[in-house]
A protein has these predicted regions:
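Aromatic-enriched hydrophobic runs in primary sequence
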Residues: 15-18, 37-38, 55, 77
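Amphipathic, interaction-prone secondary-structure segments
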Residues: 34-56
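Generic "edge-of-domain/loop-turn" microfeature
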Residues: 12-14, 45, 82
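Charged interaction segments
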Residues: 49-136
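A generic structural motif
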Residues: 30-40, 106-111
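Short, extreme N-terminal segment that most often corresponds to the first beta-strand
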Residues: 1-34, 135-136
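Generic structural signal for short, flexible, solvent-exposed coil/loop and linker residues
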Residues: 2, 7, 37-39, 60-64, ...
């Protein structure tokens, strides 16, 4: 079973804009029906997808997010990749997204575990198992 992560970016951020913010180019992606896919398994340990979506609902314990429109930045973790390397690479991209914009964002594991959130400019790390694999 794969581990899936999502960075949910409410608003109108486009896949093209986010790709650039993540240090990737249009040529790094295959685009089909509005879904941008970059196979980064060999170098980073995951497949990255970017897609616009609407009417989202995300829930974790007592936290919920219901964006009307949002960008879904998906990370499908390669189970063969070393977890520490893969998760550090994944977090590097999340941190880059945070550093290059001011939108609210939520980083979620397997569709149900909130790992990190920025809301109203405030950044909150949730104490979950993900952090065991990355150095601060």
């Amino acid at each position: 079973m794969a581990i899936e992560y999502a960075l949910v970016v409410p608003g109108r951020t486009s896949p093209e804009e986010m790709a650039s913010r993540l240090g990737l180019e249009r040529g790094d992606f295959e685009v089909s029906k509005g879904v941008w896919t970059a196979d980064l398994r060999r170098d980073r340990g995951f497949i990255l997808t970017l897609r616009r979506a609407k009417d989202g609902y995300f829930e974790s314990d007592d936290w919920t997010l219901e964006p009307d429109k949002y960008l879904h930045v998906g990370f499908r973790a390669d189970k063969a990749a070393p977890p520490q390397v893969r998760d550090r690479n994944l977090l590097d991209l999340v941190e880059r997204a945070l550093a290059t914009g001011d939108e609210d964002m939520a980083f979620i594991e397997n569709g149900e575990v909130l790992v990190l959130e920025r809301a109203g400019g405030e950044l909150r790390r949730v104490p979950v198992g993900f952090w065991n694999n990355v150095e601060p």
